[in-house]
Design a protein with these regions (language model features):
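Short catalytic/metal-binding and nucleic-acid-binding patches
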Residues: 1-176
Length: 176
């Protein structure tokens, strides 16, 4: 398989040490969990990124407005086509179609623009987002509308809203 390295079973011949326990496998594999990340224009992704120390910066509507502006900036730049998003107090979920470039470039632009503008607005410096992000490629047999509804239901599951559509910091391309 491309992107994966399997150890040579002959002792001493592998640059990757052989695993001796399941716990060791988890610890050793974790730095490469997203090694196989693959981005392709035209694919739809669910992306999640979290603030440093899970700081609830987006409990403030003014900060949410800055992040929403950054999401729209990435779309206006032709990099993404947003289908749905929800801004939770300490993270964002984003359903989008990649239009140009890579996921890494897309997320880098979103994070750098929102960080710069938010730090300026808050009169602070430093990292706003944790390193990395979680991505899920939406398969062709998965319903985009169902994915969007799942994302929009996050505030309900977190106890921030009673029903989908009530939370003010969410948006969807389709009617609810």
């Amino acid at each position: 398989m491309r992107g994966w390295r399997f150890p040579d079973p002959t002792p001493g011949n592998s640059p990757i040490p052989l695993l001796t326990s399941a716990a060791q496998a988890v610890v050793m594999a974790s730095p490469r969990l997203r090694y196989g990340r693959y981005s392709r224009t035209g694919n739809v992704y669910v992306l999640t990124t979290v603030t440093v120390r899970r700081e609830p910066l987006f409990a403030d509507a003014a900060n949410v407005a800055v992040l929403v502006d950054a999401l729209r900036f990435v779309e206006r730049a032709g990099i993404s086509h947003s289908l749905a998003w929800v801004v939770m107090p300490d993270h964002v979920h984003w359903l989008m179609e990649l239009q140009m470039g890579t996921l890494a470039e897309c997320m880098s632009l979103l994070k750098s623009r929102s960080s710069r503008l938010l730090n300026q607005q808050l009169g602070r410096r430093g990292a706003l987002w944790q390193h990395g992000y979680h991505d899920h490629t939406v398969r062709s047999d998965e319903s985009l509308h169902e994915k969007a509804m799942y994302i929009l239901a996050n505030p309900v599951r977190a106890g921030l809203a009673c029903e989908v559509g009530e939370y003010p910091h969410a948006w969807c391309r389709w009617p609810l």
